[in-house]
Amino acid sequence: MGKKARFKEARRLQKRNLNNAIGSSSINSQNSLTNDKIGKGKNKGPTERYVLPFEKNNRFLLLGEGNFSFAFSLLLHHVSSEGFVLATSYDSKEDLKQKYPDAAEYISKIEINGGKVMHEIDATKLHLHKKLKTQKFDTIFWNFPHSGKGIKDQDRNILDNQKMLLAFFKASKFLLSEKGVIVITLAETKPYTLWNLKGLAKDAGYTSLMTEKFDSSFYPEYSHRRTIGWIDGISERSPWKGELRDSRHYCFVVNGSNIKPYNQRKEKRKRSELSDDSSDSS
Protein backbone atom coordinates (compact mmCIF):
# COMPACT_ATOMS: atom_id res chain seq x y z
CA MET A 1 0.00 0.00 0.00
CA GLY A 2 1.47 3.35 -1.08
CA LYS A 3 1.78 6.45 1.08
CA LYS A 4 -1.30 8.09 -0.45
CA ALA A 5 -3.39 4.95 0.00
CA ARG A 6 -2.31 4.67 3.65
CA PHE A 7 -3.28 8.29 4.24
CA LYS A 8 -6.73 7.72 2.74
CA GLU A 9 -7.26 4.59 4.84
CA ALA A 10 -6.17 6.41 8.00
CA ARG A 11 -8.55 9.26 7.29
CA ARG A 12 -11.40 6.85 6.55
CA LEU A 13 -10.91 5.15 9.90
CA GLN A 14 -10.57 8.50 11.65
CA LYS A 15 -13.86 9.67 10.16
CA ARG A 16 -15.57 6.45 11.22
CA ASN A 17 -14.29 6.81 14.78
CA LEU A 18 -15.36 10.45 14.91
CA ASN A 19 -18.79 9.58 13.60
CA ASN A 20 -19.22 6.88 16.22
CA ALA A 21 -17.99 9.17 18.96
CA ILE A 22 -20.35 11.98 18.06
CA GLY A 23 -23.33 10.05 19.37
CA SER A 24 -22.06 10.13 22.95
CA SER A 25 -20.47 13.58 22.89
CA SER A 26 -21.75 16.68 24.62
CA ILE A 27 -22.82 17.98 21.21
CA ASN A 28 -25.82 15.69 21.39
CA SER A 29 -27.21 17.64 24.33
CA GLN A 30 -27.98 20.54 21.99
CA ASN A 31 -28.11 18.76 18.64
CA SER A 32 -30.90 16.19 18.54
CA LEU A 33 -31.29 16.58 14.79
CA THR A 34 -30.91 12.92 13.86
CA ASN A 35 -33.38 11.72 16.49
CA ASP A 36 -35.84 14.49 15.67
CA LYS A 37 -35.96 13.41 12.05
CA ILE A 38 -36.93 9.80 12.74
CA GLY A 39 -40.57 9.18 11.99
CA LYS A 40 -41.26 12.55 10.37
CA GLY A 41 -42.86 12.15 6.98
CA LYS A 42 -40.83 14.79 5.14
CA ASN A 43 -37.51 13.65 6.54
CA LYS A 44 -37.11 9.94 5.96
CA GLY A 45 -33.39 10.07 5.41
CA PRO A 46 -31.22 10.84 2.39
CA THR A 47 -32.93 10.70 -0.98
CA GLU A 48 -31.53 9.52 -4.31
CA ARG A 49 -32.53 12.78 -5.98
CA TYR A 50 -30.39 15.22 -4.03
CA VAL A 51 -27.36 16.39 -6.01
CA LEU A 52 -24.42 17.76 -4.06
CA PRO A 53 -23.63 21.26 -5.38
CA PHE A 54 -19.89 20.64 -5.32
CA GLU A 55 -17.17 18.06 -5.93
CA LYS A 56 -15.68 16.13 -3.04
CA ASN A 57 -12.13 17.21 -3.93
CA ASN A 58 -12.97 20.94 -3.89
CA ARG A 59 -11.32 23.66 -1.84
CA PHE A 60 -14.20 24.98 0.26
CA LEU A 61 -14.66 28.36 1.92
CA LEU A 62 -17.62 28.33 4.31
CA LEU A 63 -18.99 31.66 5.48
CA GLY A 64 -21.26 32.70 8.33
CA GLU A 65 -20.95 29.47 10.30
CA GLY A 66 -22.81 29.49 13.61
CA ASN A 67 -21.92 26.47 15.72
CA PHE A 68 -19.85 24.98 12.85
CA SER A 69 -21.99 21.83 12.73
CA PHE A 70 -22.55 22.14 8.97
CA ALA A 71 -18.82 22.51 8.33
CA PHE A 72 -18.10 19.43 10.42
CA SER A 73 -20.78 17.34 8.70
CA LEU A 74 -19.62 18.44 5.25
CA LEU A 75 -16.03 17.56 6.05
CA LEU A 76 -16.93 14.26 7.66
CA HIS A 77 -19.16 12.91 4.91
CA HIS A 78 -18.47 14.69 1.63
CA VAL A 79 -14.86 15.84 1.37
CA SER A 80 -12.10 13.57 0.10
CA SER A 81 -8.46 13.59 1.18
CA GLU A 82 -7.72 15.83 -1.81
CA GLY A 83 -10.28 18.39 -0.65
CA PHE A 84 -9.92 21.17 1.90
CA VAL A 85 -12.34 23.06 4.14
CA LEU A 86 -11.83 26.53 5.61
CA ALA A 87 -14.84 27.31 7.81
CA THR A 88 -15.35 30.87 9.04
CA SER A 89 -17.59 32.84 11.35
CA TYR A 90 -18.50 36.51 11.38
CA ASP A 91 -18.39 36.43 15.18
CA SER A 92 -15.23 36.78 17.21
CA LYS A 93 -13.97 33.74 19.07
CA GLU A 94 -15.24 35.12 22.37
CA ASP A 95 -18.68 36.03 21.00
CA LEU A 96 -18.93 32.59 19.46
CA LYS A 97 -18.40 30.92 22.83
CA GLN A 98 -21.28 32.90 24.31
CA LYS A 99 -23.68 32.53 21.41
CA TYR A 100 -23.01 28.90 20.50
CA PRO A 101 -21.77 26.81 23.47
CA ASP A 102 -21.47 23.69 21.30
CA ALA A 103 -19.24 25.36 18.71
CA ALA A 104 -15.96 24.58 20.49
CA GLU A 105 -16.40 20.84 20.14
CA TYR A 106 -17.33 21.05 16.47
CA ILE A 107 -14.34 23.30 15.80
CA SER A 108 -12.04 20.84 17.54
CA LYS A 109 -13.31 17.98 15.40
CA ILE A 110 -12.99 20.04 12.22
CA GLU A 111 -9.35 20.77 12.99
CA ILE A 112 -8.61 17.17 14.00
CA ASN A 113 -10.06 16.06 10.68
CA GLY A 114 -7.86 18.36 8.61
CA GLY A 115 -10.03 21.47 8.27
CA LYS A 116 -9.24 25.00 9.36
CA VAL A 117 -11.30 27.63 11.18
CA MET A 118 -11.14 31.42 11.16
CA HIS A 119 -13.17 34.04 13.03
CA GLU A 120 -14.23 37.64 12.38
CA ILE A 121 -14.52 37.11 8.63
CA ASP A 122 -16.79 39.64 6.91
CA ALA A 123 -18.28 38.07 3.78
CA THR A 124 -18.58 41.49 2.15
CA LYS A 125 -14.85 42.21 2.52
CA LEU A 126 -13.22 38.91 1.61
CA HIS A 127 -11.00 40.55 -1.00
CA LEU A 128 -9.48 42.82 1.66
CA HIS A 129 -8.54 40.13 4.19
CA LYS A 130 -4.78 39.62 4.09
CA LYS A 131 -4.98 35.86 4.71
CA LEU A 132 -7.80 35.23 2.25
CA LYS A 133 -7.18 37.54 -0.69
CA THR A 134 -4.29 35.42 -1.97
CA GLN A 135 -6.25 32.14 -1.81
CA LYS A 136 -8.52 30.51 -4.38
CA PHE A 137 -11.53 28.33 -3.65
CA ASP A 138 -13.62 26.02 -5.82
CA THR A 139 -16.75 26.37 -3.68
CA ILE A 140 -17.73 29.36 -1.57
CA PHE A 141 -20.63 28.21 0.58
CA TRP A 142 -22.96 30.48 2.58
CA ASN A 143 -25.94 28.86 4.26
CA PHE A 144 -28.87 31.06 5.27
CA PRO A 145 -27.11 34.44 5.08
CA HIS A 146 -28.66 37.26 7.10
CA SER A 147 -27.39 40.64 8.21
CA GLY A 148 -28.78 39.98 11.70
CA LYS A 149 -29.55 43.62 12.43
CA GLY A 150 -33.07 42.98 13.69
CA ILE A 151 -34.67 45.54 11.37
CA LYS A 152 -38.43 45.31 11.94
CA ASP A 153 -39.56 47.06 8.78
CA GLN A 154 -39.66 44.36 6.10
CA ASP A 155 -38.76 46.60 3.16
CA ARG A 156 -35.74 48.04 4.97
CA ASN A 157 -34.75 44.57 6.14
CA ILE A 158 -34.88 43.24 2.58
CA LEU A 159 -32.83 46.17 1.28
CA ASP A 160 -30.20 45.72 3.99
CA ASN A 161 -29.74 42.04 3.14
CA GLN A 162 -29.65 42.79 -0.58
CA LYS A 163 -26.84 45.29 -0.04
CA MET A 164 -24.95 42.70 1.99
CA LEU A 165 -25.32 40.00 -0.66
CA LEU A 166 -24.39 42.29 -3.54
CA ALA A 167 -21.20 43.28 -1.71
CA PHE A 168 -20.51 39.60 -1.04
CA PHE A 169 -20.86 38.66 -4.71
CA LYS A 170 -18.44 41.39 -5.72
CA ALA A 171 -15.88 40.49 -3.05
CA SER A 172 -16.04 36.75 -3.80
CA LYS A 173 -14.86 37.13 -7.40
CA PHE A 174 -11.32 37.65 -6.19
CA LEU A 175 -11.30 34.32 -4.33
CA LEU A 176 -12.91 32.01 -6.89
CA SER A 177 -10.79 29.51 -8.79
CA GLU A 178 -11.27 28.95 -12.53
CA LYS A 179 -13.87 26.31 -11.72
CA GLY A 180 -15.26 28.28 -8.78
CA VAL A 181 -18.93 28.14 -7.79
CA ILE A 182 -20.80 30.20 -5.21
CA VAL A 183 -23.48 28.29 -3.29
CA ILE A 184 -26.04 30.21 -1.25
CA THR A 185 -28.77 28.40 0.67
CA LEU A 186 -32.02 30.22 1.42
CA ALA A 187 -35.37 29.20 2.88
CA GLU A 188 -38.17 29.11 0.33
CA THR A 189 -40.35 31.48 2.34
CA LYS A 190 -40.80 35.22 2.68
CA PRO A 191 -38.90 37.47 3.14
CA TYR A 192 -36.05 35.43 1.59
CA THR A 193 -37.95 34.87 -1.65
CA LEU A 194 -38.22 38.66 -1.96
CA TRP A 195 -34.47 39.22 -1.90
CA ASN A 196 -34.14 38.72 -5.68
CA LEU A 197 -30.98 36.70 -5.22
CA LYS A 198 -30.56 35.86 -8.92
CA GLY A 199 -30.97 39.51 -9.85
CA LEU A 200 -28.29 40.53 -7.35
CA ALA A 201 -25.92 37.90 -8.74
CA LYS A 202 -26.57 39.10 -12.29
CA ASP A 203 -25.83 42.70 -11.31
CA ALA A 204 -22.49 41.55 -9.87
CA GLY A 205 -21.48 39.68 -13.04
CA TYR A 206 -22.64 36.14 -12.29
CA THR A 207 -24.74 33.57 -14.10
CA SER A 208 -27.07 31.10 -12.41
CA LEU A 209 -25.55 27.62 -12.75
CA MET A 210 -28.34 25.61 -11.11
CA THR A 211 -30.61 25.38 -8.12
CA GLU A 212 -31.10 22.32 -5.96
CA LYS A 213 -33.51 21.63 -3.13
CA PHE A 214 -31.52 21.40 0.10
CA ASP A 215 -31.68 18.02 1.83
CA SER A 216 -30.34 18.37 5.37
CA SER A 217 -30.37 14.60 5.90
CA PHE A 218 -27.13 14.46 3.89
CA TYR A 219 -25.54 16.48 6.71
CA PRO A 220 -26.72 14.54 9.79
CA GLU A 221 -24.66 16.50 12.32
CA TYR A 222 -25.96 19.84 11.07
CA SER A 223 -28.23 21.90 13.30
CA HIS A 224 -29.04 25.42 12.15
CA ARG A 225 -28.46 28.25 14.61
CA ARG A 226 -30.11 31.66 14.50
CA THR A 227 -27.89 34.72 14.14
CA ILE A 228 -28.79 35.72 17.72
CA GLY A 229 -27.28 32.48 18.98
CA TRP A 230 -28.34 29.78 21.42
CA ILE A 231 -30.44 30.98 24.38
CA ASP A 232 -30.46 28.68 27.40
CA GLY A 233 -33.93 27.85 28.64
CA ILE A 234 -35.52 28.89 25.36
CA SER A 235 -33.70 27.38 22.39
CA GLU A 236 -33.78 23.81 23.67
CA ARG A 237 -37.57 23.98 24.10
CA SER A 238 -38.22 25.50 20.72
CA PRO A 239 -39.71 23.15 18.10
CA TRP A 240 -38.17 25.32 15.36
CA LYS A 241 -35.57 23.49 13.28
CA GLY A 242 -34.06 25.83 10.72
CA GLU A 243 -32.33 23.04 8.84
CA LEU A 244 -35.68 21.30 8.25
CA ARG A 245 -37.31 24.23 6.46
CA ASP A 246 -38.00 23.97 2.76
CA SER A 247 -34.79 25.48 1.44
CA ARG A 248 -32.81 25.63 -1.77
CA HIS A 249 -29.20 25.89 -2.91
CA TYR A 250 -28.60 28.64 -5.47
CA CYS A 251 -25.38 28.12 -7.42
CA PHE A 252 -23.65 30.87 -9.39
CA VAL A 253 -20.58 31.16 -11.60
CA VAL A 254 -18.79 34.17 -13.04
CA ASN A 255 -20.07 35.22 -16.47
CA GLY A 256 -18.34 33.29 -19.24
CA SER A 257 -17.64 30.21 -17.14
CA ASN A 258 -17.94 26.86 -18.95
CA ILE A 259 -18.71 24.86 -15.82
CA LYS A 260 -21.43 22.28 -16.35
CA PRO A 261 -24.26 22.14 -13.78
CA TYR A 262 -23.78 19.29 -11.33
CA ASN A 263 -27.33 18.05 -11.87
CA GLN A 264 -26.76 17.67 -15.63
CA ARG A 265 -23.61 15.60 -15.54
CA LYS A 266 -23.63 12.06 -16.91
CA GLU A 267 -22.48 10.41 -13.71
CA LYS A 268 -25.49 10.64 -11.42
CA ARG A 269 -24.67 10.63 -7.75
CA LYS A 270 -26.00 7.61 -5.92
CA ARG A 271 -26.42 7.13 -2.21
CA SER A 272 -23.53 4.63 -2.15
CA GLU A 273 -21.18 7.26 -3.56
CA LEU A 274 -21.84 9.48 -0.56
CA SER A 275 -20.74 6.99 2.09
CA ASP A 276 -17.61 7.55 4.13
CA ASP A 277 -15.88 4.54 2.60
CA SER A 278 -16.42 5.55 -1.01
CA SER A 279 -15.41 9.17 -0.42
CA ASP A 280 -12.01 8.01 0.76
CA SER A 281 -11.33 5.09 -1.53
CA SER A 282 -11.76 6.73 -4.92
UniProtKB/Swiss-Prot annotation:
Q: Which organism is it from?
A: Schizosaccharomyces pombe (strain 972 / ATCC 24843) (Fission yeast)
GO MF term list: rRNA (uridine-N3-)-methyltransferase activity
Q: Which InterPro entries match?
A: BMT5-like
Q: Which gene encodes it?
A: bmt5
> Per its record, how is this protein called by name?
25S rRNA (uridine-N(3))-methyltransferase
The biological processes this protein is annotated with in GO are: rRNA base methylation
Q: Where is the composition biased (Polar residues)?
A: 18-35
Please give the residue ranges the record annotates as the region Disordered. 18-46
Q: Which GO terms describe its cellular component?
A: cytoplasm; nucleolus; nucleus
- What Pfam families does the entry give? BMT5-like
Keywords per UniProt: Methyltransferase, Nucleus, rRNA processing, S-adenosyl-L-methionine, Transferase
EC numbers, comma separated = 2.1.1.-
> According to its UniProt record, where is this protein located?
Nucleus, Nucleolus
Q: What is the lineage of its organism?
A: Eukaryota, Fungi, Dikarya, Ascomycota, Taphrinomycotina
